[in-house]
Amino acid sequence: AFYGCYDWHSSVHGHWLLARLARSFPDAEFAAAARAALARSLTSANIATEVEYLRGAGRASFERPYGLAWLLQLAAELRAWDDPQAREWAKALSPLEIESAQRIMAWLPKLNYPIRSGEHSQTAFAFGLIWDWAAATGDVGMIRLLDHRGRTYYAKDRGCALAYEPSGEDFLSPCLAEADF
């Protein structure tokens, strides 16, 4: 399902963007092509292959947390879309959604410190995406875990050093992501 980009999370993010745009602008010129692309990718067979890949040897940390967070964001977008085809896609995506959420739930209790980089591994940005999904799905356990970890990691933070951002490799602001979360 998620191929054709430099990395897996970019493909997932691209699918989220297609869903968001097609849901937000159903009569736009691009909507039919976006829906066709989603229909090609979000099949039960394709998603089963993705789940199998994730469960492969040596992939326990695959796309954690950034890619898994975007996967959950895609699932939330499909759930928010009042459309029969989107409901089919959400159902097809469900096994990968469950696998992604379970991986986050298993990982976070072991993570003693936040990851404050301006890159994919950053926790605050991923937490924001995961929180949105948890709120949309009513996953109280995930909300509680994120709330606990967020308070543990960030509650005492003051005066984030914005003058040092961005660094030479950042594409996310650790300070702004933390404030957003």
Report the location of each language-model feature:
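Extended ligand-binding groove/face enriched in aromatic
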Residues: 4, 10-12, 19-134
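Loop-centered beta-sheet repeat module
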Residues: 100-176
